[in-house]
Amino acid sequence: VTFSDKLNIDSLCKENENFIYAFWHDQLLMCPFTWKNNFDILILISKHKDGDIISKVISYMGFKTIRGSTSKPGKIKNKGGFIAAKQILSSLKNNVCVGIAPDGPRGPRHEVSDGIINIARMSNKKIVPVALGFNSKWTLNTWDKFIVPKFFSRINIAWGEPIGVDNEDNSQFQILLKNKLDLLTKNVNSFQ
């Protein structure tokens, strides 16, 4: 495992400041490998059936999860989004970091929803983008092209600069976070 730009989060940890860390949904399975800090962390996982598998794997690695996802517009069915948001805000208030895939649980792929921006604004916490690259991997035929690294694959992890969210329009922060995640993803996948 190779870490790049870890100073971005080390400085937050030294200041005892927890944060929201953001990663693309296709990298969700391996996101626990990014975590080498003193803070507790919770990772948001959907309530869909595929989320059950990912939640079990991440829990097996020693991490806790928050289960919830959004419903499609016009649907009455609640998939736990409101409860998950309350748990996330409570966790952030109690000095716990939270990991969120801003393009999950149903996409579109590599597009930032406004949920993570709203959580950052309500909690007054920074968003720290992170990306993982693998020199050998399988890419599943799913909406997000979910990545499963092959055994003995080298992992490259890069942390971006923290993003503070103010009262400006969500769209500018969505674009900023997308650009940072895309650049980090490009950089971590450029190694052999």
Question: Model-predicted segments: where are they?
Answer:
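A short, well-structured juxtamembrane/interface segment
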Residues: V1-N18, W24-M30
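Pocket-edge structural micro-motifs
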Residues: D5, F23-H25, I45, E161, ...
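Non-catalytic C-terminal accessory region of glycerolipid acyltransferases
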Residues: K36-F39, K56, Y60, K64, ...
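General small-molecule cofactor/ligand-binding pocket signal
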Residues: T2-S4, I66, A158
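Catalytic core of membrane glycerolipid acyltransferases/transacylases, capturing the structured
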Residues: I20-K77, S123
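A short acidic, often aromatic-flanked loop/helix-cap motif at beta-alpha or helix-coil junctions
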Residues: N8-S11, K72-I76, I163-E168
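Short, flexible loop segments at the rims of nucleotide/cofactor-binding pockets, characterized by
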Residues: V1-T2, I20, K75-G80, R106
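Short, Asp-centered acidic motifs that coordinate Mg2+ and/or phosphate
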Residues: F19-I20, C97
